[in-house]
Every structure is written in structure tokens, then in C-alpha cells.
């Protein structure tokens, strides 16, 4: 049930001054250390940071994880201990125990407050110990926890080699994607190369699980587009070659800092495309890449229609229902666009931070989707005030609220269906084939309450509860 609204003619952006109810960006360690297999992440912070990492990722004593806490003590903060000597001692221990290809220093709020010059210490120390060091300020001063990955990738973009630095066979062997597609058979190299159209090199950026990377790479290969590399690569030693004039495209909405670094520092050309989330977004993403590279896309309309047909059983559950985004991980606009295309309405999209330049193509596709589906445009609220949001939720009574973990239980107590937004962060939601996983997550609370009602367990479903949040 939704309150009738007058349809706005263009996207409306509001900005409130609410608190950021989100995880700390140092949580990016939890997926990046698994993605970059030869890395070691050293988080430099306080006991609070350590407690958070333990809660977020588990202790994992026997697994020997490739991340650790460098706990700041009173001597560090009062400048009685030398930062360089302490970090050198820890990095030498990491080199001796794990021997990684790269050490990533993750700065925190405390390193910012005490003005610890990690960027200045790293070049001197990496020359002394012989291991590259990447520094990233993934602190709680950011807007959303997913921006921790953005900071790390922006720092890593500086470390990508140029073609002049990579000679001979090393250049060919760096690219893990190329090796995957050729299966290591040198004899088939010419045949594989003939499947691609001659175009400017393309590098994709964004950390995705290996099956999704393979999937998107193969989707582009069907159009004759060759992916020169991914940032981050599976191994640090396989970072993509990036030269001036290369094309780059992002796969996630929260990577605006990485995009800016690639454009300004590495002189790359950014392909401003919608993000490959949902069949509609994936098709638009591929079409935009093809158009920039001068390639005529083939069969995408049929491919998209085939995926939509396979999703019909889920779409029937949400068609005509409303969804409200409170804002948490910067994926809100892409998810809202996909759910609107599935037949839902979305009165409001809360988002911690909006880079309108980087998300321009996604916002344009959102407008087009609303127009095609004949539904009102959502109101986009940047830095939403949670108290005001809850009042709006009470007035609108949406069928589903996608929210951070802090607000899920209070809203459920009010009889409102909720879904944790963090689940979309860790699920495989990119590409044509993973659209079903998005709908599986989005419809789960609706299906759960429907099934409880059918079983006669209505007392487990809170309805029309007058209590205050």
C-alpha cells in the first residue's frame, strides 16, 4: 500500500544531515584479501578497529588469514615510538612469515587524527624490505563502508605498470584473463585473437568474485571486445598494464575515486556506463562499451528478453509492490532501477553519498526505466536523516524496506518487511545470470511472511503495531 504521489518530471535530489549508520570502511579487508591472493593487509588502528574486524570476519586462528592489526599504543600516539621503526619491524615479520607480493597498509581514523604519514613512509620502507607497499586511508570519515575498496583500488591504480615497464613475454603472461580464455595453449593464440575486434585496450575496475569476472569477460568477448585486464587482478603480480589513452569502465557505483585517479593520474578515458546489475543494466553496460569502441552489439536484446522470461516467477511476487531504500552501501540507485524494471515502485532512494558525474549514466537509465514502466520518479535523498526517514516510512507504508542492520529489527517490530542492504554487497549480483540472486534476496522477507500466514502462524507477523520507533 502506498500513498498517492504526484509524479515529478525529473529526478529530485535532496540532502539531509543525518548520521551515517553504516559499517567502517576497513571492512573492505574482508573481501579484498580473498580477492588478491598474494596480498597481506595490515590495518593500523586501535583496539576498536581490531574488535570490529574480529566481529566482521571471525578470529580465524587456524586459517592463518592474510590480514592483521597493527595496534596503536600510547607510545605511538605520544610520539615516543618512531612510526618507521615500528612499521618496519611488523613488515619484516610479515615478510618472514607469509612472504606476500604486496603489503597493503589500511589507515584508520586514529592515523588521520595523529597525522601519521603513511604515504611518506611507504616508499622508503618498500625499498628497504623489497616488497611493494600500497597505502589506503579507509577510515570512518568516509560516507559508506564500500568506499574502503574504492580507496584501496585508487591507491593500487598508481602501481599498475605501463607497457614500457613490461617487456617481452612478461607482458603477455601478466594478464590472468587472457590466460584463462586461451587455457595456456600457445598454438590457439592466433585463433583466439581473431575472435576479437581491433580496438583500444580496455581495463575494467572493481572487485568481483572470480566466476562473475569470467562471466562478464565472456559476455564482452561475444561482442568481440577484449578485456586487457581487471583492477584488482587475482594476484598483485598480474596487475593490468595501463597506458595513457586506455579505456576504463567500472562495475560498481562506489568506485568514483578510482575512476578519478585513472583519468587524472593515468590519463585514461572513462566509459560512463550504467552498472552491470540486472539484465537491463548489464545490457546497457555492454552496449555503451561497444558503442565507445565502435562495435555493433549483437544479440543483446534477445539475451535480455531470455533472462527476463526466466525471472517471471519472482517478478510476480513483487509486481505492483513498493520498495524504500534507507541508504547504506551506494548500490541503491542500481538496485532501485532494477526493481522498478521488475514492476515495483520506489518512492525514495536514500544514499550516503552521490557522485552525480560518475553515476550520470545510471541516473539516466533510472529515469528512462521509470518512464518506460509508467511509475513516478523516486526522490533521491543524500545523507538521509534516519528519524525523518522513519516518519516517511510510516506515512508511505512500503511493502519492503532495504536498510542497514541497525534499523531492521525496529522496523520489523512495526510490521514492515525489511532486508539487510549488506547482503546485496556480498552476494553475486552482477551480470545476466546473477539477476535471479537479487530477486531471491529481495523477495525473501515477502515470501517468508506469506508462508507464515498460510501456516496460520499470524502471531509471528507483527501487523498494525502502534508502538513508536
UniProtKB/Swiss-Prot annotation:
GO biological process, one term: light-independent chlorophyll biosynthetic process
EC number(s) on file: 1.3.7.7
Cross-referenced Pfam families: Oxidored_nitro (PF00148)
Molecular function, one GO term: oxidoreductase activity, acting on the CH-CH group of donors, iron-sulfur protein as acceptor
Keywords, alphabetical: 4Fe-4S, ATP-binding, Chlorophyll biosynthesis, Iron, Iron-sulfur, Metal-binding, Nucleotide-binding, Oxidoreductase, Photosynthesis
Involved pathway(s): Porphyrin-containing compound metabolism; chlorophyll biosynthesis (light-independent)
Residue numbers binding [4Fe-4S] cluster: 24, 49, 109
Cofactor: [4Fe-4S] cluster
Cofactor: binding details: Binds 1 [4Fe-4S] cluster per heterodimer. The cluster is bound at the heterodimer interface by residues from both subunits.
Reactions catalysed: chlorophyllide a + oxidized 2[4Fe-4S]-[ferredoxin] + 2 ADP + 2 phosphate = protochlorophyllide a + reduced 2[4Fe-4S]-[ferredoxin] + 2 ATP + 2 H2O
Family affiliation: Belongs to the BchN/ChlN family.
Subunit structure: Protochlorophyllide reductase is composed of three subunits; ChlL, ChlN and ChlB. Forms a heterotetramer of two ChlB and two ChlN subunits.
Role this protein plays: Component of the dark-operative protochlorophyllide reductase (DPOR) that uses Mg-ATP and reduced ferredoxin to reduce ring D of protochlorophyllide (Pchlide) to form chlorophyllide a (Chlide). This reaction is light-independent. The NB-protein (ChlN-ChlB) is the catalytic component of the complex.
Protein name: Light-independent protochlorophyllide reductase subunit N
Gene expressing this chain: chlN
Amino acid at each position: 500500500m502506498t500513498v498517492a504521489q504526484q509524479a515529478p518530471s525529473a529526478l529530485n535530489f535532496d540532502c539531509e544531515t543525518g548520521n551515517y549508520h553504516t559499517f567502517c570502511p576497513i571492512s573492505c579487508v574482508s573481501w579484498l584479501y580473498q580477492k588478491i591472493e598474494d596480498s597481506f593487509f595490515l590495518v593500523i588502528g586501535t583496539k576498536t578497529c581490531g574488535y570490529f574486524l574480529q566481529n566482521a570476519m571471525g578470529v580465524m586462528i587456524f586459517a592463518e588469514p592474510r590480514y592483521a592489526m597493527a595496534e596503536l599504543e600510547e607510545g605511538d600516539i605520544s610520539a615516543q615510538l618512531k612510526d618507521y621503526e615500528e612499521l618496519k619491524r611488523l613488515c619484516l615479520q610479515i615478510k618472514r612469515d607469509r612472504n606476500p607480493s604486496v603489503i597493503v597498509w589500511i589507515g584508520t581514523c586514529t592515523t588521520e587524527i595523529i597525522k601519521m604519514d603513511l604515504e611518506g613512509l611507504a616508499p622508503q620502507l618498500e625499498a628497504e624490505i623489497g616488497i611493494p607497499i600500497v597505502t589506503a586511508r579507509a577510515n570512518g570519515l568516509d560516507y559508506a563502508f564500500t568506499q574502503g575498496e574504492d580507496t584501496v583500488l585508487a591507491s593500487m591504480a598508481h602501481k599498475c605498470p605501463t607497457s614500457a615497464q613490461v617487456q617481452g613475454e612478461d607482458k603477455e603472461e601478466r594478464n590472468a584473463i587472457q590466460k584463462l580464455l586461451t587455457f595456456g595453449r600457445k598454438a590457439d593464440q592466433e585463433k583466439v585473437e581473431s575472435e576479437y575486434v581491433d580496438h583500444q585496450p580496455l581495463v575494467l575496475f572493481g572487485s568481483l568474485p572470480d566466476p562473475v569476472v569470467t562471466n562478464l569477460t565472456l559476455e564482452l568477448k561475444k561482442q568481440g571486445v577484449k578485456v586487457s585486464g581487471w583492477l584488482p587482478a587475482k594476484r598483485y603480480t598480474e596487475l593490468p598494464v595501463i597506458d595513457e589513452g586506455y579505456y576504463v569502465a567500472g562495475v560498481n557505483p562506489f568506485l568514483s575515486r578510482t575512476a578519478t585517479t585513472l583519468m587524472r593520474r593515468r590519463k585514461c578515458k572513462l566509459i560512463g556506463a550504467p552498472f552491470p546489475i540486472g539484465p537491463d543494466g548489464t545490457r546497457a553496460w555492454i552496449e555503451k562499451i561497444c558503442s565507445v569502441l565502435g562495435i555493433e552489439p549483437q544479440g543483446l536484446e534477445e539475451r535480455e528478453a531470455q533472462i527476463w522470461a526466466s525471472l517471471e516467477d519472482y517478478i510476480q511476487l513483487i509486481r505492483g509492490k513498493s520498495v524504500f531504500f534507507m541508504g547504506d552501501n551506494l548500490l541503491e540507485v542500481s538496485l532501485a532501477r532494477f526493481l522498478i524494471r521488475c514492476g515495483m515502485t520506489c518512492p525514495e532512494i536514500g544514499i550516503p553519498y552521490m557522485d552525480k558525474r560518475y553515476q550520470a549514466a545510471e541516473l539516466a537509465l533510472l529515469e528512462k526505466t521509470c518512464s518506460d514502466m509508467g511509475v513516478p520518479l523516486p526522490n533521491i535523498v543524500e545523507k538521509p536523516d534516519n528519524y525523518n526517514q522513519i516518519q516517511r516510512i510510516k506515512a508511505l507504508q512500503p511493502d519492503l524496506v532495504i536498510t542497514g542492520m541497525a534499523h531492521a529489527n525496529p522496523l520489523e517490530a512495526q510490521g514492515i518487511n525489511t532486508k539487510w542492504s549488506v547482503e546485496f554487497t556480498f552476494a553475486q549480483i552482477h551480470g545476466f545470470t546473477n539477476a535471479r540472486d537479487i530477486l531471491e534476496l529481495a523477495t525473501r522477507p515477502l515470501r517468508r511472511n506469506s508462508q507464515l500466514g498460510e501456516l496460520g502462524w499470524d502471531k509471528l507477523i507483527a501487523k498494525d503495531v502502534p508502538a513508536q520507533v
